[in-house]
């Protein structure tokens, strides 16, 4: 009988703990849903503001969720285009950011955009989206379907876009780094952008790194700032995190 009482008491304690755990899980789930709705609302607002800035309807822009550049990141890009007034832009990873840049710089015949993409199908898709929207409209634009090849940097070997045959400008005013894809097997996938293109960066150049809250991008930023101490970093509180690098 004593053993039965002990078992019943133990079961009761377990049930109480499970009830408490269930309440905590419900609270966490509600919090996640709340912040998910907040972020979604903010991004919808940013998308509308961006569309207004570009002078287009909201539906003119391709989808800006999932893997695509988020509206808040694209708003940062638009602000930097106004600030830097770039002649030459290079971006790593084509897509909605390419369309945004082409629209922002439309009609400026002295401007050039070079966009890398490791996947030829993605590059072609971006080209088709641009054509549907009547872009680049006078601005020079190259979408380079550049496969990943080995680059040796400081004795280390990295996979990054093939640059041979790509018409890179001698002076880059704005460098957008939103590719290659970072994975657990290649956390520093975006690191080569700065060491490989550093000598082409103009005096007024600005570097923008998307997804800067992730561990891989954080590791990339750490190495960049250690290896290139003449640069300083500003973190912008976008949904995925944006890092802006400028010369000191």
Annotated model-derived regions:
Residues 169-179:
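Short SAM/SAH-binding signature in class I
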Residues 96-108:
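Conserved SAM-binding loop of SAM-dependent methyltransferases across substrates and taxa
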Residues 1-54, 181:
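Heptad-repeat coiled-coil amphipathic alpha-helices that mediate oligomerization/assembly
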Residues 110-117:
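Conserved SAM-binding motif I beta-strand of class I
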Residues 50-84:
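Class I SAM-dependent methyltransferase Rossmann-like catalytic core
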């Amino acid at each position: 009988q004593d053993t039965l009482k002990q078992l019943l008491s133990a079961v009761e304690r377990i049930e109480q703990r499970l009830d408490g755990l269930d309440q905590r899980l419900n609270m966490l789930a509600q919090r996640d849903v709340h912040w998910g709705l907040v972020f979604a609302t903010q991004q919808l607002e940013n998308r509308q503001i961006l569309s207004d800035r570009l002078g287009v309807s909201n539906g003119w822009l391709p989808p800006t969720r999932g893997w695509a550049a988020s509206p808040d990141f694209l708003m940062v890009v638009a602000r930097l285009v106004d600030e830097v007034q770039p002649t030459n832009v290079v971006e790593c990873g084509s897509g909605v950011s390419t369309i945004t840049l082409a629209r922002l710089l439309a009609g400026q015949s002295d401007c050039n955009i070079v966009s890398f993409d490791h996947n030829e199908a993605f590059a072609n898709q971006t080209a088709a989206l641009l054509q549907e929207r009547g872009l680049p409209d006078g601005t020079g634009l190259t979408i380079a379907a550049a496969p990943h090849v080995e680059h040796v940097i400081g004795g280390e070997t990295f996979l990054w876009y093939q640059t041979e045959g790509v018409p890179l400008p001698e002076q880059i005013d704005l460098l957008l780094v939103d590719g290659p894809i970072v994975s657990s097997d290649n956390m520093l996938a975006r690191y080569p952008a700065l060491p490989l293109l550093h000598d082409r960066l103009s005096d007024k150049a600005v570097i923008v790194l998307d997804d800067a809250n992730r561990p891989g991008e954080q590791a990339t930023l750490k190495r960049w700032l250690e290896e290139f101490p003449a640069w300083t970093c500003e973190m912008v509180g976008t949904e995925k995190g944006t890092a802006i690098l400028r010369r000191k």
